[in-house]
Amino acid sequence: ALHMSAQTFSTDRRGVLILSHYSCSSAGTVVAKLSGLQKVAYPLQIGNRAIGRVLPVGDEVTHVSVGDLVFSHIHHQSHSLGSQLVCRIPDELDRAAASMLGMALVALTGLQTAQPQLGDTVVITGAGLVGLFAAQLASLSGAYPILIDLVDHRLEVARSCGIQNTINPIREDAKAGVMTLTNSKGAEVVLECTGVPTVATSATEYAGRNGMIVFVGSPRGEYQTDITPFLEKVHLWRSGGNLTLRGAHEWKIPIEDNDFTRHSMERNCNLLVRLILEDRLKIEPLVSRVYDPEDVAQAYRDLSQHKDLVLGAIFNWTNYHQ
């Protein structure tokens, strides 16, 4: 249930107090924590992505001002101190869908890790929020995405965002489908966005020789198997072999721009905002439902039990501003 309490915030020299407008949870990390699939200590504050307005800021803060609309990695609550990334975004994005920027940031890190070339095929396993953004970003990069998921509704959302090639393994052989679409060569890149170990180890089935598998989704749950066939697929010089494995955790890149790295979370946030405003990156079709924070229990039931209908839970905090 929603917990109401008075809280005093103190902004230090670099602190930013944020009045939340909309916050977002996907069906991944938070559900894994609440279900016990990912071990965490309680009590636990949940949620880590939201947009809102800047209230007081510390004396050394220069990148945002009072009244700015910002995205930040903050909890599901009406007021929060900005956490690490606080990125100013245009007022045009003061809407529920923009709270999903954080999921697009995860996907973009995967694309930047893989660095697909113009004309490459990119297989994306998992059509949750991250996978749906990854497929769109792959297409924007000049690659040909193939999106694989067990849920027809998710693939319908993908097609509404312009992703033409989708595969449901329940209805067809996924490997055969990928090979048909790649003239039997396999994909240059596989982005594993589910975090499900069985899906991760089967990702080699979709890769072509010298291909790359990038782990975007965080792995969870126990999985016992003979790992040798997977390692052979990665190691041996044969069709679909000699593969490169790379991790693409969201936090692998710096938060702020600097002179020594090409990518940062700040730069990525600004890039995604630009793509959204240019209507090149679709976000509205990915909104399943916007919840009142009072309905948090229902929201997480929907995320865990109705993945066929709910991609993510967005909470509207605008009725809790005082």
Descriptions of predicted regions:
Residues 8-25, 33-75:
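Glycine-rich beta-strand-centered segment in the early N-terminal region that forms part
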Residues 145-149, 215-216, 248:
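Short beta-strand "acidic-cap" motif of Rossmann-like dinucleotide-binding folds
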Residues 184, 209, 214, 223-224, ...:
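C-terminal capping/lid region of NAD(P)-dependent oxidoreductase domains
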Residues 175-179, 227-287:
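C-terminal substrate-binding/catalytic core of Rossmann-like NAD(P)-dependent dehydrogenases/reductases
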Residues 164-246:
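Glycine-rich cofactor phosphate-binding loops and adjacent beta1-alpha1 units
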Residues 83-85, 119, 163, 183-187, ...:
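Local beta-strand N-terminus motif with an aromatic residue
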Residues 46-48, 63-127, 155:
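NAD(P)H dinucleotide-binding glycine-rich loop of Rossmann-like/cofactor-binding domains
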Residues 97-172, 176:
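Mid-domain Rossmann-like dinucleotide-binding core that forms the NAD(H)/NADP(H) cofactor-binding site
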